[in-house]
Amino acid sequence: MSAELIEKIARIPQFFMPNLNHSKDKVAFFWDITGRVELYVMDLQTKEYKQISNGEVPRALRAGFVWTRDNKNIIFAKDKDGNEKHDLYMINLETKETKQLTETPTFQEHVAHTSPDGKKLLFLSTRNGQRNLFSYDFKNQEIQELTNYPRPIFGAFWSPNNDYIVFGYNDSQNLHNGDIWIMDVDGSNQRKLLSLKDGSRDGVTDISKDGKKLAITSDFEGNSKAGIYNLETKEIKWFGDSSSEEYSGKISDDGSFLVCARNSKATVSPVIYNIESGKEKSLEFPPGIVAGTAVTKNDEFLVLTLNSSINPSRLIKYDLNSHNIDELIPIELGNLDPDFFVTDEYVEYPSTDGLTIGAILYKPKKIKLGEKLPVLVEIHGGPTGQYYRNFSMFDQILVNNGFIIFKPNFRGSTGYGRKFQDMNIEDIGGGDLEDIISGVDYLKTLNFVDKNRIGIFGTSYGGYMTFWATVKKPEIWKAGAASVGITNWKLLYDESMPHFKHYLHMLFGELDKNESLYIERSPINFVENLEAPLLIIHGTHDPRCPISQARVYRDKLLELGWKEGTEGKKTFEYREFTDIGHGGYTDQTFRVRSFKTILDFFKRRL
């Protein structure tokens, strides 16, 4: 495959975070059609759109945006080179002038919601330590701290009647719990509103137009399910049969239906429930990702994004009466042939303890009889991430270069129920590694797999697992590529922000009580076992997995006699990118550079 073709695929335009205005007749979204992510606004009736920003928004997106209540401005968060120390900005849709609202260069700030009278912004910030809720007064520019908790706040909504704010918090001894809280809009009268079970994760996704009902999601029965909570009667109405993970979304303006998302076997599809009768209305789409729960004015349309393994994302308007689909942003392939792309396959296999693991498999279209091909095992982040049957530029590049791609959703992944997701708690790098190794055993049963050419790669937790697998099961791997990965859990804890420390507590337990586990599951302590050549990629501005994670591993390799080099035994390759943080998939320039670097490595080493 030529460098030119790789670049064309890596630069297929992507759009992100479509968000309706308060009148529900326009949609704003990020789009990289120009080669850089910019902010756009489209009229849903005419489909006319205009570019709003010109370099003011981040290249690598890590935060969303909200509309002001008059629909004249959009408020977004921006960091510097991926360091995730966001400040808040407001851009006017007519003049395109940008105004900085907050300036906290060493802290994180994220928009949450706006007050219904348009006077205030609700936002999350770490400016006082832990991530808490604050309000910003647009007129006098005053900032008020609304909460001051020792654990992080998760999301918040301002009621339509301006009489309460709901938010997510956990005050339980059980770190894996999540409850719904409520307070007055000035921050007073804070209290727990709903806790279905100690240990369940309960959250709000929307408030009805009259302010009397909350759309909620909870996993108190195992699988996540959607419901409506009545603030007046305290009653909950649940929907679905709990056979699949389902997440609540938006409530229609007339309050008659709830739009949800169903996650099953690595696909996501919309489901509509009649709130009164509980009856389900499924919307039929091909396997893939059909995302979005936004309902337009007069409850006529859903605004959704569609993509599959062979089709990049497109933005559509789905008519709830006729079921017709109207494309708002079509697929932009340029002169790429759609037949070039390879369809995926969803497979299942048993792990060492009999647990069923789902995975996504790509194989080249034309495999000759008796041909044996190299395999790349691709590991997702999180560890609570999930691989879906969605379009992946890099997977298409790899499979069209003759690699088999295998993407397991190992224990700890989202999408398979709460019990499955919690199986790696205090067992990071244990059962999940066994699931991956069992996946390799499954691959070896396929007659087109070269058992001696198996590689592994991933980003974030996928980077950790690449480091970990290559030192704990060195005999399996011929090469590995770790991007923004973790090599030393204790060092990561020491360098983490308070809300990241809380997440590590959830995975490992508290450091002073479980320090031995942090040490025992760190690849840095087993480097002497490494046999496979490694590619290490890291962004110098990464706040989640700081650059020190890569540097200490590099130094340990050098200490043990390894050398930086592109060929030969006991050699590794090392790249620091000085213009990114924790990856940068939404940045086309980063995609091109990253794809070419990793592909070149595996073509040489595997």
Regions found by a protein language model. Give the residues of each.
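Extracellular/periplasmic ectodomains of large secreted or surface enzymes and adhesion receptors
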Residues: M1, S252-G255, N274-S277, K281, ...
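Beta-propeller blade-edge and WD-like acidic-aromatic loop motif
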Residues: M1-A3, F30-Q51, K72-N73, D79-K99, ...
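Conserved beta-strand positions that form and line the central face of beta-propeller blades
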Residues: K8, Q51-I52, Q100-L101, E145-L146, ...
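Conserved beta-propeller blade repeats
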Residues: R11-A28, E56-A77, L88, T104-L124, ...
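Flexible loop/turn segments at secondary-structure boundaries
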Residues: N174, S200-R201, N223-S224, E246, ...
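Cap/lid segment of the alpha/beta-hydrolase catalytic domain
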Residues: I331-N452, T459-S460, D494-H502
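Active-site-proximal cap/loop segments of hydrolase catalytic domains
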Residues: F410-L606
